[in-house]
């Protein structure tokens, strides 16, 4: 069997002129500068490949180049395995449970205050924080949704009392956690009664037979959300006013639920700032390695679909379709939502896959092209049979034969090709 591409003319594999390039070698071993400038970033970049395939090393190099060439851009980096934080630069911040001199200590009340409509912003943040819990609650959905309303009521009262005391700092997460973890049903009712006219319906939830179960849900959420909480008054809105800085979100697998909550809400706030009508359309680059570690409730679909004109540039790394669908677990439209997200990426880098599912995923994302398939008969007297088909120009065998650092790339409308990325050091702290 013989495959033949039917492209009318040879295309380059990347833009001939680009402000950002990575050193690599083509399939023949010749040096090549792969163009990955803004023309490519505007269509977002998808990276596939298994563990140890070299994709993180290449992403790290690309991040360093972007920071050098775009000094006025902001960067949000999801760091699941600690591969990026060692390369941080002066002025960068790290969100984690371990503190440190450059720690980003987020405060939900300070984040709300940065908005022109702080109470609406607070309600939106609480909805995002509870979204995954509500979607996966099943028959317990009532209790989780009621806990969301109670938690919002508590934060609303706390914020209004703080705003009445001019000049005083916002209550810290540590202070709020200390009160929430030990509060009784009566204490929570008394707290909500400070805004009785507005929160009367919420207070009534704590007077029925389900009151104890609802408060228990609040305690469970507070335990996860405030785990490792400390003193601090940082906000994403304020962070993004400083060009050239990077915020690293250190997802800790040992504290999976707390990590999901913290990283998801910070991504959501960055996306909300980017999509607001007041945003200055300055570039914000999102590097989401191991993106499937977080549910998509933080607004990934909106970021990809609407963010380009506002300055969003997104790189996501997935291994297979199952990972993407798992981000939408609990939604009736899980599969279609996953496909919608994947359709937003116009450039693909496919590194060595680890399984058949990974191979299928990479070939599907690399796309199809017109090909002539010629089948030769068993007898020399039998004429060959030729048929026109559409198929991926990269075979499963070719993908499985990739070595560490090698990848098949398809950048927007350019031709797919195999490249080997050169190793180099990334400047950092």
Description of each model-found segment:
Residues 304-408, 412:
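Conserved ATP-driven motor cores of ASCE-family P-loop NTPases powering translocation/secretion/packaging/pilus
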Residues 1-5:
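Interdomain "pre-motor" coupling segment immediately N-terminal to P-loop NTPase/helicase cores
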Residues 7-14, 18, 24-32, 38-312, ...:
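P-loop NTPase motor domains
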